[in-house]
Amino acid sequence: MSLKKISLENFTVFSKMEIDFCDGINVFIGENGTGKTHIIKLLYAACQAAQSKKTGIDFQTKIVKVFRPDEFSLLRLSKRGVGASNSSVKVFSNKSNLVLSFHSKFKKNVETTGSEKWEKEFAELTSTFIPAKEILSHSRNLVQAINAGNVDFDDTYKDIISAASVNVSRGPDNERKTKYLRRLQTITQGRVKIENEEFYLLPTGQSQSKLEFQLVAEGLRKIALLWQLIKNGTLEKGSVLFWDEPEANINPQNIPAIVDLLLDLQKDGVQIFIATHDYFLAKYLDARKTKENHILYHALYKSNDSIQHESESDFALLENNSILKQSIDLYKEEVKKVME
């Protein structure tokens, strides 16, 4: 089971868009405002909607919760500047599809189809969205405050706190999990501990000492979050990981280790969706992939007042590659300076 395709019409920045995915790692690149995060949020909402019988939150509601438009109005997510129009979000898997249709002016025209088959196919699916900004250092009572409407965060922040707060996993760590945990612990120099809804880092070899997450560098907190999600069984075979800007606040020297982890998770059956601006992350994925890895790059770009896309399995083959373009421009500037 995996996500295969998304089709959008008159939704946020998109007029018409249809993107096919691979079962492995899908990497979205593009300038700001091209909708990278919008796409992975929609896919996450579709995954979460499969649990609607348990959570009471359907596809339409989850979309509103992850985008948080004014007045929680779905209609505000229609593409602006096109007048009265029909909008739709369609997400396809191997065996089913989930469709949300609505009109930009009429609330009563909202319709969701395909929910029953979708929920049946993905009944056991675990999906996780890691936002660009680290939030675990502010986790104490935050979920309750969000639910009470006292603070304004979209659901991706609340959900990642809930996912990380699961403090146990079934049975002892297997060989695969132990390998991942040791690799990440080499970077963080510690493991995660949860006490009274607070996250701490226990430095390696100092069992009686603990560091509040607020005292740990943000980049290391993000890596510690990965450690916790693997430790508690959230990232397992058959799960889906969405990660917005993995490179944010990460020391560049740790990017290769993150890439190796993502490649191994994919080989172990985790489907991954990433939105990034980082040349090193995108290029390391391309350079270190093996025949066992499946990677598809999706470049989003602006053309004639609309968002277009192209997809390639080879990073260098993308014609509208904003990341590579900036790297080349920088190289030209350096050469010019040397030649002066």
Model-predicted regions and their roles:
Residues 5-7, 46-241, 303-340:
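Phosphate-coordinating catalytic segments in nucleotide- and nucleic-acid-processing enzymes
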Residues 42-47, 282:
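DNA major-groove recognition helices of helix-turn-helix
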Residues 25-27, 127, 240, 271-273:
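Residue-level preference for the first positions of well-ordered beta-strands
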Residues 244-246:
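Walker B catalytic acidic pair
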Residues 17-23, 233-236, 264:
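Phosphate-binding P-loop
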Residues 257-340:
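C-terminal lobe/lid and adjacent interdomain/linker elements of RecA-like ASCE P-loop ATPase modules
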Residues 1-44:
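Pre-Walker A-like glycine/lysine-rich segment at the N-terminus of P-loop NTPase domains
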